[in-house]
Amino acid sequence: MKKLWIVLGCVLLVTGCSGKSGTKETKQEKAADPVVKTEEKDDIRDVSFVAVGDNLIHGAIFYYNAKGDGTYDFKDIYEHTNRYTRKADIAYINQETICGGTELGLSHYPSFNGPYEVLDAVADAGFDWMAASSNHTLDAGVQGILNQLAYMKEHHPDIRVTGSHATREESEQLQVITREGVKFGILGYTYGLNGYVLPKGKEYMVDLIDKDKIKNDVEKLKKVSDVQIVSMHWGTEYSFEPNEEQKELAQFLSDLGVDVIIGEHPHVIQPMDYVTGKDGNQTLVIYSLGN
């Protein structure tokens, strides 16, 4: 009987993306996780996990990273954290700003759309998992989502993207990342879309927080992964404490057997805690990583 130990190895609280170096084993299934140790008899494996918060690109950041020829370079934003994200076995970022490219027109608060160079910087910084379900995911419409996903698939296919999907078939695919023989299953959800509504028949494009869906997703993921990590876009902006809904959802996820919960959206740091599930399991909850 395999024993699984989950230990928080390194959590970064930064504004921006990151890149990586070295080889990281990836599979068509996908998953991610914090410094995780799995033990089966004398078999001990260490996997390091680094996570950062909301990568939200405001207008001033566009301005200061413009090259003057219509292109952008955001890589220097992450140069001081690359040593962490590139070294980690799995590095996670919440890509809050949708990056549908300049062809859709760049925009910032309150409705965002960024250039593809943001995604290049994320890749250069070494991220393996990009959460792409937030209240800003539909800011550039359906085309913004499709453009971002197409760019990631063509230029950065090794980065796992959760929470948004180009097709119904893709929305049903399980994502698992394998490191040191340990399979990390990953999921991501958002509380809403800032009043924007997905077209009828396209509801699959963004994973919204829905208990029935989450339960079904987690149950399927547990069959093909050793560790389950869920990204949750939730909470109250600029509040340093989790609200009751966050706590209730954390308990719900723990009861399902989820191992790690990564929270975003408040734009400030909130506490970390362990929640005990109904079967006595312990779930590490990071309520908010800030920006």
PLM features: residue spans?
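Sec-dependent N-terminal signal peptides of Gram-positive bacterial secreted proteins and lipoproteins
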Residues: 1-22
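Acidic, metal/ion-coordinating pockets
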Residues: 17-291
